[in-house]
Amino acid sequence: MDNAVDRHVFYISDGTAITAEVLGHAVMSQFPVTISSITLPFVENESRARAVKDQIDAIYHQTGVRPLVFYSIVLPEIRAIILQSEGFCQDIVQALVAPLQQEMKLDPTPIAHRTHGLNPNNLNKYDARIAAIDYTLAHDDGISLRNLDQAQVILLGVSRCGKTPTSLYLAMQFGIRAANYPFIADDMDNLVLPASLKPLQHKLFGLTIDPERLAAIREERRENSRYASLRQCRMEVAEVEALYRKNQIPWINSTNYSVEEIATKILDIMGLSRRMY
């Protein structure tokens, strides 16, 4: 067996496999193991299911260790094929549905693609999500200052502190219209809140980052440049944090947080409603 991998983990679904991945990752994060992940969406027919079973079995025979299989599959005939594999199979949805069925005294009506599929009865939410993504892309990195009043949150920060990925995650995951505005080196001699942002101060949220981490990120982009120097990064971070404090702008240090954690903290601090899709 590959010494760098403790377990092979499959995430299998007749839909996008997002639910299987999210719940499976949450479970596996509780164990001190290194995993090799294999995600297999849209396992919708018996031929595809048999190919997946063969893939699971091949890894078992190669390694001698049962792969872990997290699955979410509606059709019983497809499930049956996966369960015949040499993997240790866990139906992540049924594990929650069964006790709820007993508690609510209702029978579930499972439908493939229901969790992350496009529901004809839910097109307004889908359209709102796409509009949020379009808005966020159009207002990335200060590209456009038009219609900033339509933003639900405006992220501020120095270059490469995480504004763009956080904005896009907010838009794609929660349908939040998130603009972001960069403070660049040329701003630092007299750093003030831009006039275009002052009327929208209630929508502003700042990001900062440890200078050492910022320098490492910038070095990958512009090696041996003033832009990536630790001295420059320390100066920019200090100036921006002083601006946040002076203008009472809420802010967090993004250094030790994932994009998901940063976005969730922003939603909580800014009082924005979460919309799941």
Swiss-Prot record:
Keywords, alphabetical: Kinase, Nucleotide-binding, Serine/threonine-protein kinase, Transferase
UniProt-listed Enzyme Commission number(s): 2.7.11.33, 2.7.4.28
Record field: transmembrane: none
GO molecular function, one term: ADP binding
Residues noted as binding ADP in the record, renumbered to the chain: G157, V158, S159, R160, C161, G162, K163, T164
Pfam families: Kinase-PPPase
Domain of life: Bacteria
Cellular component annotations (GO), alphabetically ordered: cytosol
Substrates-to-products reaction catalysed: [pyruvate, water dikinase] + ADP = [pyruvate, water dikinase]-phosphate + AMP + H(+); [pyruvate, water dikinase]-phosphate + phosphate + H(+) = [pyruvate, water dikinase] + diphosphate
InterPro entries per the UniProt record, alphabetical: Kinase-pyrophosphorylase, PSRP
Protein purpose: Bifunctional serine/threonine kinase and phosphorylase involved in the regulation of the phosphoenolpyruvate synthase (PEPS) by catalyzing its phosphorylation/dephosphorylation.
UniProt subunit comment: Homotetramer.
Family: Belongs to the pyruvate, phosphate/water dikinase regulatory protein family. PSRP subfamily.
Name of the protein this chain belongs to: Phosphoenolpyruvate synthase regulatory protein
Gene name of the encoded protein: ppsR
